[in-house]
Each structure stands twice: as C-alpha cells, then as structure tokens.
C-alpha cells in the first residue's frame, strides 16, 4: 500500500465511522437514561 491510497481510505473512515460510533454511543446513553 502506498501513501497515495491513504486519503481515499482515511477520509471515508473518519467521515463515516466516527459519526456512526458517536451516534451509537449517544443512542445507548439516551436509552440507558430512559430505562434508569
């Protein structure tokens, strides 16, 4: 793997995976808060 392929992988990874993790964690936090 060369450095030229790095942006095409890291940009979608940060742009899609990070918001997805944030949404899941916030959803779990809200669900726990409602249950308790």
UniProtKB/Swiss-Prot annotation:
Membrane topology classification: Single-pass membrane protein
GO biological process, one term: photosynthesis
InterPro entries hit by this protein: PSI_PsaI, PSI_PsaI_sf
Record keyword Metal-binding present: no
Cellular component annotations (GO), alphabetically ordered: chloroplast thylakoid membrane; photosystem I
Transmembrane spans: 9-29
Keywords: Chloroplast, Membrane, Photosynthesis, Photosystem I, Plastid, Thylakoid, Transmembrane, Transmembrane helix
Keyword Membrane: yes
Annotated localization: Plastid, Chloroplast thylakoid membrane
Known role: May help in the organization of the PsaL subunit.
Family, per entry: Belongs to the PsaI family.
Protein name, as recorded: Photosystem I reaction center subunit VIII
Naturally occurring in which organism (per UniProt): Huperzia lucidula (Shining clubmoss)
């Amino acid at each position: 793997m060369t450095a030229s392929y790095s942006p095409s992988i890291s940009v979608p990874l940060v742009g899609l995976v990070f918001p997805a993790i944030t949404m899941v964690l916030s959803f779990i936090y809200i669900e726990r808060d409602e249950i308790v």
